[in-house]
UniProtKB/Swiss-Prot annotation:
InterPro entries named among the record's database cross-references: Ribosomal_bL28, Ribosomal_bL28/bL31-like_sf, Ribosomal_bL28_bact-type, Ribosomal_bL28_sf
Superkingdom of origin: Bacteria
Protein name: Large ribosomal subunit protein bL28
Gene Ontology biological process terms in this record: translation
Alphabetically ordered keywords of this record: Ribonucleoprotein, Ribosomal protein
Gene Ontology cellular-component terms listed: ribonucleoprotein complex; ribosome
Family, per entry: Belongs to the bacterial ribosomal protein bL28 family.
Taxonomic path: Bacteria, Bacillati, Cyanobacteriota, Cyanophyceae, Synechococcales
GO MF entry, a single one: structural constituent of ribosome
Name of the gene: rpmB
Gene3D superfamilies: Ribosomal protein L28/L24
Length: 78
């Protein structure tokens, strides 16, 4: 399974690790992904999602159905 958020599509970012002597090395910054089982009220069922903590925070604010609609995602297919 790839390390990609199923709702937002967030994936790893290429960055640089900079030491005290300013030597730069490439570094992969992974998304903070969590496996969650969320209740979808409109579908009256549980949905297993691998989502970022940022998406989880937005779901707590807006609700799963409303957030998925705003992203153009059909939860019935998940």
């Amino acid at each position: 399974m790839s390390r990609v958020c199923q709702l937002t599509g967030t994936r790893a970012n290429n960055g640089m690790a900079v030491s005290h002597s300013h030597i730069r090395t490439k570094k992969l910054q992974q998304a903070n992904l969590q496996q969650r089982r969320l209740w979808w009220a409109e579908g009256k069922r549980w949905i297993n999602l691998r989502i970022t903590t940022r998406a989880l925070k937005t779901i707590q604010k807006k609700g799963l159905g409303a957030y998925a609609r705003s992203l153009g995602i059909n939860l019935a297919k998940l």
